[in-house]
């Protein structure tokens, strides 16, 4: 009996997490821009569950140092992120059918509000199951920030 309870509890937990993901998002540039802001805020809160709703199972990211990260690797790293926040600017979105992308600039701030990095990013999305999901991301570090 105990053997059956564990898988059932696990399935219910996964279903509850999936139920919290947004539904019926519009297929608009504005929706993608809002998603990027929500993603940045979730990273600042170290909220891996919120980010998990925003990235597709096959998500891959090319980091500023050129290393590649899968969805699970990226999500596992979120709780270990340094304290701080992300300030997104210069964002542009484009939607073509079920695909879209956002390009922008992320100013990474330390807890005092000082800019510690400037990162140009491009995120590619697909519209699936009534919501936008990131398929891929790429970041480029824009020079060193004086400390």
Which residues are covered by each model-predicted region?
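Bacterial N-terminal signal peptides
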Residues: 2-15
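A beta-strand edge to alpha-helix "cap/lid" segment located at domain peripheries
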Residues: 19-53, 58-147
């Amino acid at each position: 009996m105990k053997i059956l309870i564990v898988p059932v509890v696990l399935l219910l937990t996964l279903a509850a997490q999936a139920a919290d993901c947004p539904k019926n998002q519009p297929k608009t540039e504005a929706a993608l821009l809002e998603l990027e802001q929500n993603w940045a805020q979730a990273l600042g809160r170290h909220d891996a569950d919120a980010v998990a709703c925003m990235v597709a199972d096959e998500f891959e990211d090319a980091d500023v140092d050129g290393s590649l990260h899968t969805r699970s690797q990226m999500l596992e790293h979120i709780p270990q992120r340094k304290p701080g926040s992300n300030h997104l600017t210069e964002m542009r979105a484009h939607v073509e059918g079920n695909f879209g992308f956002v390009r922008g600039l992320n100013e990474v701030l330390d807890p005092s509000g000082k800019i510690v990095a400037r990162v140009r990013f491009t995120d590619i999305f697909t519209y699936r199951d009534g919501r936008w999901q990131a398929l891929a991301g790429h970041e480029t570090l824009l020079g060193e920030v004086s400390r």
